[in-house]
Swiss-Prot record:
Its main location: plastid. The chain crosses the membrane at residues 32-52. It is a single-pass membrane protein. Keywords: Chloroplast, Membrane, Photosynthesis, Photosystem II, Plastid, Reaction center, Thylakoid, Transmembrane, Transmembrane helix. One of its GO terms (biological process) is photosynthesis. The lineage of its organism: Eukaryota, Viridiplantae, Streptophyta, Embryophyta, Tracheophyta. One of its GO terms (cellular component) is photosystem II reaction center. This is Photosystem II reaction center protein K. InterPro entries: PSII_PsbK, PSII_PsbK_sf. Coiled coil: none annotated.
Length: 61
């Protein structure tokens, strides 16, 4: 039960402060990876679209 409560608190806190999660800055040593990190959230969408392209290629069997 305490695990569910702590998970609920974590989710509630991330809803209250979403900007700290989505707009956190990388440390200065990793600043060269900023363009890659900005692009990374889009990558799962490509897999989702690839599934549709694949099904279209096999005629949605």
């Amino acid at each position: 039960m305490p695990n569910i409560l702590s998970l609920t608190c974590i989710c509630f806190n991330s809803v209250i402060y979403p900007t700290s999660f989505f707009f956190a800055k990388l440390p200065e040593a990793y600043a060269i990876f900023n363009p890659i990190v900005d692009f990374m959230p889009v990558i799962p969408l490509f897999f989702f679209l690839l599934a549709f392209v694949w099904q279209a290629a096999v005629s949605f069997r």
